[in-house]
Amino acid sequence: MIIKQSSNVLRKKRHLRLRKIIIGTITRPRLNIFRSNKFIYVQLIDDNAQNTLCSVHSKETNVIGSNIKAAQAVGTLIAQKALALGIKNIVFDRSGYLYHGKIKALAEACRQSGLQF
């Protein structure tokens, strides 16, 4: 009998493959995304110092839920915090999620707010 792996296990495998390549530094930190059923969490991470520079989650915004509007609000908020720290260039880590829907909306909101990746 063939047992199919869950989509979360497959996502974690993709994430581990990507993490071998993607490394954040102090000048170009890694934008890490975690998407739960209710909320979206985003962090800017310096992997060399193993330090989180700033973080934002959808609970901080006025938009309720984990939809595309919440992702756009989180994207603009993390971009504002990053620009306040003097960070303009980042490395985008999609954490194994497919690049569509909420992840794409968050990335485009970051780009429109002034971040480059």
Curated annotation (Swiss-Prot):
Example of a GO MF term: 5S rRNA binding
GO cellular component: cytosolic large ribosomal subunit
TM stretches of this protein: none
Stored Gene3D superfamilies: 3.30.420.100
Keywords: Ribonucleoprotein, Ribosomal protein, RNA-binding, rRNA-binding
Pfam families: Ribosomal_L18p
Domain of life: Bacteria
InterPro entries, A to Z: Ribosomal_uL18_bac-type, Ribosomal_uL18_bac/euk
GO biological process, one term: translation
HAMAP family tied to this protein: Ribosomal_uL18_B
Subunit composition and interactions: Part of the 50S ribosomal subunit; part of the 5S rRNA/L5/L18/L25 subcomplex. Contacts the 5S and 23S rRNAs.
PANTHER family xref list: 39S RIBOSOMAL PROTEIN L18, MITOCHONDRIAL, LARGE RIBOSOMAL SUBUNIT PROTEIN UL18M
Function: This is one of the proteins that bind and probably mediate the attachment of the 5S RNA into the large ribosomal subunit, where it forms part of the central protuberance.
UniProt record similarity statement: Belongs to the universal ribosomal protein uL18 family.
Protein name: Large ribosomal subunit protein uL18
Protein source organism: Phytoplasma australiense
